[in-house]
Swiss-Prot record:
Cited Pfam families: Tubulin, Tubulin_C
Compositional bias segments (type: Acidic residues): 429-445
Protein's recorded name: Tubulin beta chain
The organism's taxonomic lineage, starting at the top: Eukaryota, Sar, Alveolata, Apicomplexa, Aconoidasida
Residue positions binding Mg(2+): 69
Amino acid sequence: MREIVHIQAGQCGNQIGAKFWEVISDEHGIDPSGTYSGDSDLQLERVDVFYNEATGGRYVPRAILMDLEPGTMDSVRAGPFGQLFRPDNFVFGQTGAGNNWAKGHYTEGAELIDAVLDVLRKEAEGCDCLQGFQITHSLGGGTGSGMGTLLISKIREEYPDRIMETFSVFPSPKVSDTVVEPYNATLSVHQLVENADEVQVIDNEALYDICFRTLKLTTPTYGDLNHLVSAAMSGVTCSLRFPGQLNSDLRKLAVNLIPFPRLHFFMYGFAPLTSRGSQQYRALTVPELTQQMFDAKNMMCTSDPRHGRYLTACAMFRGRMSTKEVDEQMLNVQNKNSSYFVEWIPHNTKSSVCDIPPLGLKMAVTFVGNSTAIQEMFKRVSDQFTAMFRRKAFLHWYTGEGMDEMEFTEAESNMNDLVSEYQQYQDATAEEEGEFEEEEGDVEA
């Protein structure tokens, strides 16, 4: 019941995805060959959210791996859990998108997309009651951003009533891999605003900061970063997979976190994060977890929640704890920091409690927040976009694939609208309700 089909697109998506399956397989006691070697019935009770049981008791992930070049796929296949995936579910081209959004969305990607959709339909048909899709991709490259958003819009057409959740790695302010990142990211956001239900915003710089500051790693690798992301990803779906006192799922998350349809970009965090050396010096209590998860240093994207206000927030606790204590703590945070929560949504935090903690921890919490501070992220990308677009730099790579300059202008204005919408709700107070409703009508139109 309540299955989720997982899709990983492009190099970044496949690397995060591979790490995610390692984490999930560990939680469910499934070894790299797909056989169950755990010790608790709870691990198998709802293993079918992410796994399909094949013949001979083998568990196969409901995962689709796609890329426009074979390189990353080969390394996933050669990786520790590479033999877990169904061989037919590797869909790849040979050319590569060359960091070009237009190639991923219009030319190369469009040729490969039907093959991906066929595999997707097979997976969806194998589901009892499909809850939705989760996609891991980056917005800076060509495949994850261009082809990823193409796939999202195709899935939207075919499964309009299913939840579409993406884990999107945004270009980071100081760490840039490619020159045309701002173009690719802006064009992608333009699509995500319209077609995705929830977008979890991640960026490498924030992850590096967490690794340096909190985990005290001297030379963090992408593996470490991806591990952070997958810990939080596993937390988002834990109540679907394990019994709990207070459940949440992707749809409940969406309903509780999205006050206006366009504002569905969430920042998220995970606690407890401690360096390996200092683990034994910390007591894990609900107050301590709550304290850390609301900490700005804990967010997986470079926007400071203290610069904006939370429209809504959601905390997914895992482990043995009293729900009373959880509720008290959440209320406590809201009362003490009331200026950081908008006043026109009275009880704007949701919490859920799941009994089974992640491996190696007694308690943990995943935090998802819808904060107006995320506009910093969009502003930053938008400024870089404008700087290049004003000079029409690198534009011929996109127009050469059949794109029109108009599309860039549209994407840019959509991004700027998004920023001003966040700003508008950040400044809104409970009193101006009357004039506000008229404005709201305009936004929708």
